Every structure is written in C-alpha cells, then in structure tokens.
C-alpha cells in the first residue's frame, strides 16, 4: 500500500510497464546476441593467390585461429596480429563496433573467421564486412596505414526532400554533426564516437564513426571525413560507408546501442581450449538457462528497488535544474557565501572608488581597478543605482556566472551587497579589451598574425563552452571587440553577459520584443525581427573574425570606400578573388596566406544571411583546428536597412536599443561583465 500511495495507481502501472519493457528488451538483446552476425559484403581481389599447402596458408590459419581463440582482445573490440616471416608473413586484424559487448564481438569474429576461407578460398588479401565487425588480412603490412580500397557503400531507400533548400539544410546538418563525431573519434583512444542530435521535435539524427585504433589521430580524421563526404551526394535520409580502415553511418533512427556506449566491459571467461579453425566456438549459444533466469530476476528486483529509491528521493528534494526563477535564485544565493566579499574590503581596494582608479564605464555602471591587501589586482564593477540591471538579474548573475569556469571567459571572483550598493568583482585584465589594441593606430603593432589567430581560436573556444560544453546553454547576444578582454599574454576572454539568455534543454531559438545590442554585430534576423539563437552568436563571431584580420571596425567604412560596411567590402573582395586585400597591412608580410584566406572563408560562412546556412560553433572550431575539413562555398552575407536606432547615451561603444514592438524590460538578463 505504501508503494501505491507513493506513486499512485497510474504511476504504479507505469512502473510495472517500464519493468516489463526493460525485461523484454533485455531478453530480446540476449537472444539477438546469440544470433549469427549479419553479413554485409566482402572484398578479396584476385591479384595474388596462395596454394592450400603453402607456408602462407599455414600462417593464415594460425592468425585466424588466434582471432577465434578465447584469448583474443574482445574486451577492447580490436586486435591486430602478424604471423610468419617474409615473404609468407600474414598481417590481420578484427574490429568490432564500439557499442557492442565482448560476447557479441567474439561471436562475430568467430563466425567471420569460419566463413572467411569459404568466401575467399585462395586470395592473399581479403576484408569481410559484417553488421557487428570487420575482419581483414593481407600479405602486405597495412597496420597504422589508411586503406581506401575495398569500399562498401549502403544507402537508406528513402530520399531526402526534393525541395532544394530543405535538402541542402539536411545535408549541412548531417555533415556538420558527423564531422564533429569524426573529430571526437580521432582524438579518442578507441577511435570511436557516436552522435545524437534532435533535428526537429519529431526527428532525431543518429550517427556513428569508427577507425581502427592503430591509426594516428590525423589519419583517422582524414579517413572519416572522406567517408562522410562519400555519403553526402547520395541525398538519402540514411547511409553507411566502409573502408577497411574506417567506417561511418547516419540514420533517423537509433541503430546502435545507446546504453552500451562507454568503456567496454572485461572479457568473458570462456570454457574449453582454443577451438579448431574449421569449427570455431561461438560463445553465447551454450549458456546455462538457470543462470540466465536468476540473473534476470535479480536484475529486475534491483531495478525496482532503484526506481523506488529514486522516486522517493525525488519526492524529498523536488529540485529542478532548469532556468532558475527569481525566488529560486534568491534561495541559491545562500550557497554563494564563498563568493561574498566584505564591502569595506572592496572600498579599500579601490581607494574608496577613486576617480583615478576608474578604468571603464558603461550602461550598467562604472568599473574600477582594485588591489587587495595580498597584492591581487581585480576589476570592480559598481552598478549604478538607476541601472537597468535589477535585483533578480544581479542575483542570477552571481549564481549562474560563478558556475561558468573556462579559460576564455572572464571569471567572476565575488560580489558584495551593502544597502543599495551592488558590486561585482572580476579578474583583472591588464590589456583591457580587444578594441583598445586592434583599432588604435599606436597599439595595432602589438598584434601580429599569430596573436590574432590565437585570439580567433580562443573566442571560438569560449563560445563553444557557452553553447555546448557548459551545464547551461547560454546565448551571449552581444559579442563584439569591446567585450573581448585580453590577459597579460594576449589570451582572449569573453566578457559582458548583460544581454545573455539561458536556453532550455530542447530550445534552439527565442524571440524578444526589445532588441538590444550593437549594430554591425547583430544578425539580421535579430536586428529586424528579434529572433536570436546560437546562430546569431555565430554571426557576431564572423564579424569579429573579419575585424581581427582587417584591423578595421565594421562601422569604419563610408562611401569613399565603395562599401557601406566591412561585410560588403569583404564579400566584394572575395567574389573578385582578391581576398588578401582585406588583410591589415601591418601583418600582410608576416602571415601565411592560406591560413588567412581560410579564416576569411570561415568568417564569411558565419555571416551568411540565412541562419540555417551558418555553421555551428563546434563546426567552426573544427574548421579552425583542422585543415582537412572541407569548407562549403559561402553565400552572400546578411544585409539589412538600418532604421534610426535609439542610442544609449551611457554606452561609449554605441550599443543600441531598438523597439520593434511595444517594449518590455530585458527579461532573463543573466550578467554583465565589464566593460560596457
């Protein structure tokens, strides 16, 4: 009765249903694991052969027997072996799909070994493709080398929409997500990665990529990106491509085992001795049924207890981790005691907020340089009493921004509440903001090309953290040169989150009736319609990239330049194939032309008018860090007619506020890092 009262009848029924489905799934997967592997294809070119009584034949049988033995590396899903001596040496490997158990792996390898000499009876080299594994051997030493022969391409029977725009958008999404998975796989020890991305509320993209783990990082990445590129022209909603060295697949349904992704379990203990080559043992078919039943019962009981305990704890805590309301933020402030600073300490550090210590001023207050008694230098933002940043926003800033820890974000060190005083303390940036160096003729020489390239990459890393890698998904909405601060080593740190918004778990865009930001950096869809998303941040990043390369403000152009802004100027140079004319003359003779042109290309991709055409920041970061990623052709940048904005007289960087519809207060502002 306690359980019924705790869950309710409907909840209890749901729980029983869940357990039933779990057991059904478990039994189904157990049964499936004992089935024969699903054969896809094989390739055994008839270029060279061997006789049945030759030394090569003996070496091959030795190698295959090793793969089918109980001592094979089923737990890692990969093994390579060389048997014999030159010229009769045989090199071989097996590779199991990274989401499968050691039992399924051993079953597939043993099965493929048993079939190999039937499918390719006398060929010296062969590769066998199964749903669960790949088996390969050759008289050549192919280890740690990418092989682009023996290709297998399979396609989903369903085509993508015949509408050109929808088709291109789908392909772009698939390619960017699969390339991200390829990058993750190449940088992992197992050379394996999966992706799961919601395309719409009804469609989810699943992807899987894998290399043989003996490949170097760059070789794996090159193989996978080539594999992915081979699938894109098929224009299908799903496809897979195999080479002996790597393979990739995407579908709109879950084709891999999501629950098994992770560190492989230890290899099972198989009874008996090494099986003969002609009849390798297939583990899993002789299991003890009594043990299986006991295991299922115990598993079900443990699952039930775990669910009851979880629900009981959930009833006790009733705590959500989504965007906090003002009252919740107020409660959480109690947990931020470690960040709360004594007002008098800050007052002393800034010499009572002396005018000589003032280093910046913006719409939300003034910024002072301070020095604590231990010698630590800090930046102190003192919010003005008539600031638009209210009590709830201030609390949200302390609670949320304190959790954003990244080397390319300015760090919040503490806060203080004293009467009407609202003070925020940040790490001090001795080189101030990017615009102070980039657009100052006397200081521009401090930024050579390598430093500018490092700044571009650092900004991308910071945005990637906000959009994808942090616990919260945060849209900055005001990325510009004055909001990129530089530390003592000219490393960039994103600042000023006063206009930022938190997105929910499944949220991809939002709208606002009060458009705030800086013209020239605003994406067209935001400036004209109040629509913002991760892609609007990408647009602002693209403008920053072009400013960093050219050393010119987006707003510094006039009619004498023959262009209204930096984007128009860049686009004309690009279409005239004179992109290098954009480069700041101060660095033109000390930079790699190919690297600069690639950055210009990336910048133009980011500022395309259609948000769907812009790459995600993760794709941008991959483009910046790997020259093997193919860049698509950029479309024309976003252009829009600027209405007469209402300038904020307190903002020295000409941030603007445009009222597109009856205005409301800036809802859900997160924080405001100096300077403004």
UniProtKB/Swiss-Prot annotation:
GO annotation terms (biological process): defense response to bacterium; plant-type hypersensitive response; signal transduction
Lineage: superkingdom: Eukaryota
Active site positions: 478 (proton acceptor)
Endpoints of the signal sequence: 1-34
Protein kinase domain span: 353-639
Glycosylation sites: 46, 53, 71, 114, 159, 187, 257, 288
Catalytic activity, EC: 2.7.11.-
Family of the protein in this entry: Belongs to the protein kinase superfamily. Ser/Thr protein kinase family. CRK subfamily.
Protein name: Cysteine-rich receptor-like protein kinase 8
Lineage: Eukaryota, Viridiplantae, Streptophyta, Embryophyta, Tracheophyta
